[in-house]
Regions:
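Mg2+-dependent phosphoryl-transfer enzymes with acidic/Ser/Thr/Gly-rich catalytic loops
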Residues: 3, 174, 181-264
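Asp-based phosphoryl-transfer active-site loop
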Residues: 4-22, 211
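The start of beta-strands in P-loop NTPase/AAA+ ATPase cores
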Residues: 6-8, 68, 198
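Short, flexible loop segments at the rims of nucleotide/cofactor-binding pockets, characterized by
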Residues: 19-23, 48-49, 176-177
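Active-site phosphate-binding/coordination module
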Residues: 25-124
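Anion (oxyanion) recognition and catalysis
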Residues: 37-38, 156, 234
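A generic structural motif
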Residues: 38-42, 160-161, 216
Length: 264
């Protein structure tokens, strides 16, 4: 299917970056994204990393190209800084997001306390604090995290706006309205790119919100993606690649750009 890709939204770790592979980056994938940028497409990295951790990753893995925008911490929207520095908030989304989270954590103390008590009593997971506030969890295994998220799903029925973002053994507490998909939707609104011209690729739980078809009409995932991600991509009539990591992203981009170049 020949489609016009104007905005590319990619996860970072596990999608573009294959930590245990050599090379870590797929050269053909990076070259294609760079070529699309030269042709006028915009590329954003949509990640659970903070701005600082993403910048260190771009440096550590020697990315030869730069994203046009970054969506960080599974919620915030940044553009290149116009007044020194590398990045600045794009619009007032980040402020609105911070306010919503402050109000949520103030009103959801009983839910959060119950979750932390469950974690401390019944698991070996570690609670991560940002100052005095609990920000998230690190489990000892994915099976342990499965058990924790099952409990969270039970208790959050009392306060549905209390939610979480999960990636392997890591979990971040968050407002249900703010996630990778919502951040992508805000960016697309700000730069006036419709859903029909957005390609998105990811591999794990926290990527589902940008791969379920609501915010990107061209969702995709590499072969190393977990089954719930593959299911979401298939349900959205997207593309599940046969190759892993960046090679899979490259394969998916070619699928949408050139039709079925790589036969499934």
């Amino acid at each position: 299917m020949d489609q016009n890709v104007r905005l590319i939204s990619t996860d970072f770790d596990g999608t573009l970056v294959a930590h245990d592979n050599d090379p870590v980056l797929d050269p053909a994938c990076i070259e294609l994204i760079g070529q699309l940028q030269q042709d006028g497409a915009l590329w954003t990295i949509n990640t659970g990393r903070s701005v600082e951790l993403l910048e260190s990753g771009l440096l550590d893995f020697e990315f030869p190209i730069r994203p046009d925008f970054i969506l960080t911490s599974e919620r915030d929207v940044f553009r290149p800084s116009r007044n020194g520095g590398k990045w600045e908030p794009f619009g007032n989304w980040n402020d609105r997001c911070a306010q919503a989270h402050a109000e949520l954590f103030n009103s959801a103390q009983s839910v959060l306390t119950e979750i932390i008590d469950f974690v401390n009593r019944t698991t070996k997971a570690r609670v991560i604090y940002l100052g005095p506030a609990a920000e998230g969890l690190v489990a000892t295994s994915e099976e342990e995290m499965d058990r924790i998220t099952e409990f969270i799903e039970q208790v959050r029925t009392r306060q549905p706006e209390f939610n979480y973002q999960r990636n392997t053994i890591y979990l971040r507490f968050c407002h249900a309205d703010y996630h990778k998909g919502a951040a992508l939707a805000e960016l697309s609104r700000l730069i006036n790119v419709p859903r029909e011209e957005i390609f998105a690729a990811g591999d794990h739980h926290n990527d589902v919100s940008m791969l379920d078809g609501r915010f990107a009409a061209m969702p995709a995932c590499p072969a190393n993606a977990i089954d719930p991600v593959k299911d979401a991509v298939r349900s959205a009539r997207g593309y599940v690649a046969e190759r892993e990591f960046g090679a899979g992203v490259h394969e998916a981009l070619l699928h949408f750009l050139n039709g079925n170049v790589l036969k499934r």
